Amino acid sequence: MGVTKKPDLNDPVLRAKLAKGMGHNYYGEPAWPNDLLYIFPVVILGTIACNVGLAVLEPSMIGEPADPFATPLEILPEWYFFPVFQILRTVPNKLLGVLLMASVPAGLLTVPFLENVNKFQNPFRRPVATTVFLVGTVVALWLGIGATLPIDKSLTLGLF
């Protein structure tokens, strides 16, 4: 059972806020039926209406039409698969490449056990998790940018 905080209606600060119309959710307002029946459907239907309106007013093509007689030299995946594509492209052994890809989520699953993250919310007080995040972001960007370059410049990004 959760502990509910009852408002102190004798508190002059709370009475002043309530008199001004503030403090609407100070002691809680039930999500049923107010939010779930009235606010959420309006937001969802409004989002759908905006998407449909933009699709009708400005239709865009999905991509270039396919030409089977003029294929590109190298077929690139979507941008979010660039780091994975770069790993598979640069590692000579395909089994090792697949194991490297599987080691990324396995390594991320070990991060919570390396330090007690339940105690602190501030990232500066969680150096291991912050370091893993920063190194992972830099490596993912490095691999993603390298996937768009030719294979001889892909690891150095043409800088060295």
Swiss-Prot record:
GO terms for biological process: photosynthetic electron transport chain. It is found in: Plastid, Chloroplast thylakoid membrane. One of its GO terms (molecular function) is electron transporter, transferring electrons within cytochrome b6/f complex of photosystem II activity. Keywords: Chloroplast, Electron transport, Membrane, Photosynthesis, Plastid, Thylakoid, Transmembrane, Transmembrane helix, Transport. It is a multi-pass membrane protein. The chain crosses the membrane at residues 36-56, 95-115, 131-151. The keyword Membrane applies. One of its GO terms (cellular component) is chloroplast thylakoid membrane. It comes from the Eukaryota. Signal peptide: none annotated. PANTHER family: CYTOCHROME B. The 4 large subunits of the cytochrome b6-f complex are cytochrome b6, subunit IV (17 kDa polypeptide, petD), cytochrome f and the Rieske protein, while the 4 small subunits are petG, petL, petM and petN. The complex functions as a dimer. Belongs to the cytochrome b family. PetD subfamily. Component of the cytochrome b6-f complex, which mediates electron transfer between photosystem II (PSII) and photosystem I (PSI), cyclic electron flow around PSI, and state transitions. This is Cytochrome b6-f complex subunit 4. The lineage of its organism: Eukaryota, Viridiplantae, Streptophyta, Embryophyta, Tracheophyta.
